[in-house]
Amino acid sequence: MNIPSFPLPSRPNVEIQFRHPVVKETITYCNMEPGSEERHVTEYLNELQTGEKQNSALWTAQDRRTALWWIMVNSRLDNKEAFTYTCSHCNEVHVHDVDLCDLAETVELLTIEPFMRVNVPVAGKPTDWTLKPLDGRGQELLERMRALLPDADSPEYEQSLARLRIAEFALCTSLDDDPESFEAAADRRLELMENMAVETEFSPLVAHIQLMQKSLRHGLLMTFNQGAAQVVLPAHHCEKEGMQMKSTQLFIPFHGRLFIPRFSAGWMANHH
């Protein structure tokens, strides 16, 4: 059974037709390990497409997460979720009950091309860069890099974390003379960035990338850190008497496994 067609937020003229998830998907994706979640998200989004299929690895990270949400809210009977957090205003634990259908109010569709062109020099040589949102291939690569990070108390941790951040910048760009291989091209851009002059080359490029990310905002309202998505929930007001005017904006890790139907433990029970 199909659900309403889904316009890709980055390219609204492209509509994707998904079907309802079925039991075999709850079995296939019942145990997504950290480090492989984005690969499974790609498989899931590709599998649920009907008609002419597109490779969701080429969609933006925002397209992919918004598609997961779209499938879920259009195929579940109850889309209410409870999120607990410690309130910074009263230091008490609150429960924020959210109807995930309400997140539709934050969805934006792009009305311009999903990329920007800038010229920033590399080693003094004028260079044309294409800036674009992170895509599924980049998410998978960053996920593998995150899984290989050393322990936080390791002497190599800060260096590895900085290199991960530069890799994220590299994956939001492309060059006209990129190698055909996605990973080879990403590695080459990473190496170029590591050898850029800090103040006159790299800093301006980062500023352009951050402006691109702000200007090309699309899909659900979310933030990204090291390629990992966080969905922005509606603000929740403090529940303590006299402090109801104060509110907290919640950022919830947008794990794909939370938006893909799971095999219910209750189905395993034998009541005979």
Functional labels for PLM-detected ranges:
Residues 1-272:
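Long C-terminal interaction/binding lobes of large macromolecular proteins
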